[in-house]
Amino acid sequence: MDKNLLEAVKFDEKGLVCAIAQDAETKRVLMVAWMNAEALQKTVETGFAHYYSRSRQKQWMKGEESGHTQKVRELRLDCDGDAIVMLIAQNGGIACHTGRESCFYKVWRGSAWETADAVLKDEKEIYGSTH
């Protein structure tokens, strides 16, 4: 592991740090996930976003199933060292597992959350019927 890469990052008690994927061109926030030290190291080594799945308890590369990979253009660490922003190029224009550009597709409209973004590709087309 690269000590210079990891020493400034404040991983939580579970060894994770918040990772935000933001489109490098539009600046739209596409998703928020978690990274452990291994996922961060793999991201730097490969140039593609890797995360740690809390539900599956394993590291994964974004797009390994869907093909919607995230090419990292820049990594930024916040002032407290406990959150990372990755400026990325989103392959296929879909970051969300629901088939939308962003995971942040719901908008509060005063009394309810409304879906603001259309599905670009159906989940079954992306992952097959087993997802």
From Swiss-Prot:
- Gene Ontology cellular component list: cytoplasm
Detail which positions bind Mg(2+): D78, D80, D82
Q: Where does Zn(2+) bind?
A: C79, C96, C103
What's its top-level EC category? hydrolase
What pathway is this protein a component of?
Amino-acid biosynthesis; L-histidine biosynthesis; L-histidine from 5-phospho-alpha-D-ribose 1-diphosphate: step 3/9
Provide a GO biological process annotation: L-histidine biosynthetic process
Pfam families for this protein: PRA-CH (PF01502)
Cofactor (UniProt)? Mg(2+); Zn(2+)
Keyword Coiled coil in record: no
Q: In the record, what terms sit under GO molecular function?
A: magnesium ion binding; phosphoribosyl-AMP cyclohydrolase activity; zinc ion binding
Kindly list the places in or outside the cell where this protein is found, as annotated in its UniProt entry. Cytoplasm
Q: Which domain of life is it from?
A: Bacteria
What does the record give as the reaction this protein catalyses?
A: 1-(5-phospho-beta-D-ribosyl)-5'-AMP + H2O = 1-(5-phospho-beta-D-ribosyl)-5-[(5-phospho-beta-D-ribosylamino)methylideneamino]imidazole-4-carboxamide
Query: In its keyword annotation, does this UniProt entry include Nucleus?
Result: no
Q: How is the cofactor bound?
A: Binds 1 Mg(2+) ion per subunit.
Question: What EC number(s) has UniProt assigned to this enzyme?
Answer: 3.5.4.19
Predominant subcellular localization, coarse grouping: cytoplasm
The entry assigns this protein to a family as follows:
Belongs to the PRA-CH family.
| Role, per record | Catalyzes the hydrolysis of the adenine ring of phosphoribosyl-AMP.
Q: How does it assemble?
A: Homodimer.
Under what name is this protein listed? Phosphoribosyl-AMP cyclohydrolase
Organism annotation: Neisseria meningitidis serogroup C / serotype 2a (strain ATCC 700532 / DSM 15464 / FAM18)
